[in-house]
C-alpha cells in the first residue's frame, strides 16, 4: 500500500474549521448540518473541562443566536441541522438544551488525522476480457 502523509499547522479557528469539514465529509452531513456542527464545535470549545474532559455541551438559543451570539442562521435552520446531528449520533439529548457529545467526534486536542483509503475495484472475468480486448487492463499471469 502506498501512503502520502502531509502535516499542516493551523491556528485554533482554522483547525476547528478543518476538523469540522473533515468530519462533515466523512459522515455525509448536508450543508445545514455542517454549519450547525461548526457552531456546536465552537460552543464545545468554549465549554470548560471537568475532570480532564467535557462530555456535554449547552446549546441554548436566545437573543437571536446560540448562547446569545449570532451564528448566521435562524433558530429554525439551527434546529434542522441539530436534528441531523442527533440522528447521526453526533450528540444525544441530556436535557432540553444540554447534549451529550460523541467523544469520537468532539475533542479538545491539538491534532487530527483523516485517513481515506482507496481500493481498486475488482473486475469480473467478462469485464476483464472486454477491457483486455480494448487494451485497457493489464492481467497479471
Give residue spans per PLM region:
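Positively charged, low-complexity terminal tracts
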Residues: 1-2, 101-103
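Short recognition helix of helix-turn-helix/winged-helix DNA-binding domains
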Residues: 1-58
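Terminal low-complexity, poorly structured segments
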Residues: 25, 62, 69, 133-135
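Short, amphipathic alpha-helical interaction segments positioned at domain boundaries
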Residues: 105-141
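Winged helix-turn-helix DNA-binding recognition segment
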Residues: 44-100
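N-terminal start-of-chain detector that recognizes signal peptides
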Residues: 6-11, 63-64, 70-74, 127-129
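N-terminal leader/presequence segments that precede the conserved core
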Residues: 1-2, 79, 141
Amino acid at each position: 500500500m502506498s501512503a502520502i502523509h502531509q502535516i499542516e499547522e493551523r491556528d485554533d479557528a482554522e483547525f476547528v474549521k478543518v476538523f469540522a469539514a473533515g468530519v462533515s465529509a466523512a459522515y455525509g452531513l448536508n450543508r445545514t448540518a455542517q454549519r450547525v456542527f461548526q457552531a456546536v464545535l465552537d460552543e464545545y470549545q468554549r465549554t470548560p473541562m471537568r475532570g480532564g474532559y467535557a462530555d456535554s455541551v449547552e446549546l441554548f438559543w436566545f437573543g437571536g443566536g446560540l448562547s446569545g451570539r449570532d451564528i448566521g442562521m435562524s433558530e429554525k435552520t439551527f434546529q434542522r441541522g441539530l436534528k441531523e446531528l442527533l440522528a447521526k449520533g453526533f450528540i444525544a439529548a441530556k436535557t432540553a438544551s444540554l447534549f451529550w457529545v460523541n467523544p469520537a467526534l468532539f475533542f479538545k486536542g491539538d491534532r487530527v488525522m483523516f485517513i481515506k483509503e482507496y481500493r481498486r475495484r475488482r473486475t469480473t472475468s467478462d469485464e476483464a476480457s472486454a477491457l483486455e480486448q480494448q487494451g485497457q487492463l493489464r492481467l497479471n499471469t
